[in-house]
A protein has these predicted regions:
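The C-terminal cap of the DNA-recognition helix in HTH/winged-HTH DNA-binding domains
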Residues: 40, 81-82, 112
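Ordered, amphipathic secondary-structure segments that act as subunit-interaction surfaces
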Residues: 72-87, 91-93
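Short, Lys/Arg-enriched N-terminal segments with co-localized hydrophobic residues
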Residues: 1-9
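N-terminal cysteine/histidine-rich coordination modules
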Residues: 10-28, 32-59
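Flanking helices and flexible, charged tails adjoining ferredoxin-like Fe-S electron-transfer domains
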Residues: 9-18, 59-77, 99-188
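Nucleotide phosphate-binding site architecture
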Residues: 29, 86, 102
Length: 188
């Protein structure tokens, strides 16, 4: 609705934006605090294998966080044969219905970054749900002073971040060329 001055106002329940987790791979120290915070938030204990964010080091000194890019076309959703995946309209995050998901892995194959993983002891996919709008991985990364992760507020479905939906080996290869130039061929 509009105010007297014609300014568009939003109700307190409706947010004009969704969030996305920005990433600067060059700032990642490899501390894995993000994996710990994620597993504590979702599993109630330190269990990096059940984290929705993973940190990879495929080349020495090049650590990189790997998490859902929140693709605007979300190819993982139609790939699910049981309809266990959906988009949270408030945050824009992909959500997994644990009760429906069979752990078949179709979402992994459909994801351009192969981001989803299957829970280590249960039969359901793990995909970043943005912690309901308050990403714990970002908090600990910022608190640690690394600033490899940050929250980006965006208009609902205004920008595609699919360029971040890459497999870790692709990202590390790009980083290796950026940092090591001619030596990159030997490293990757």
């Amino acid at each position: 609705f509009k105010s007297k001055r014609g300014v568009i106002l939003m109700s307190s329940e409706e947010k004009p934006y969704q969030i996305w987790i920005g990433r600067n791979y060059a700032n990642c120290s490899g501390c894995r605090r993000c994996e710990i915070a994620c597993s504590l938030h979702h599993e109630g204990r330190i269990w990096p294998e059940a984290s929705r964010i993973r940190v990879f080091m495929l080349v020495p000194t090049l650590e990189m966080p790997h998490l859902c890019a929140q693709c605007d076309d979300a190819p993982c959703i139609p790939s699910c044969p049981v309809g266990a995946l959906s988009v949270n309209e408030e945050t824009g995050a992909i959500t997994v219905d644990k009760d429906k998901c069979t752990g078949c892995g179709n979402c992994i194959d459909a994801c351009p970054g192969r981001v989803p993983v299957i829970h280590p002891t249960e039969k359901y996919a793990l995909i970043c749900d943005l912690c309901g709008g308050d990403p714990q991985c970002v908090k600990v990364c910022q608190e640690g002073g690394y600033n490899a992760l940050w929250v980006v507020k965006r208009e609902k479905k205004s920008v595609s971040y699919k360029l971040y939906a890459k497999e870790p080996k692709e990202i590390v290869k790009e980083l290796a060329y950026k940092f090591y130039r001619d030596l990159a061929e030997e490293l990757v």
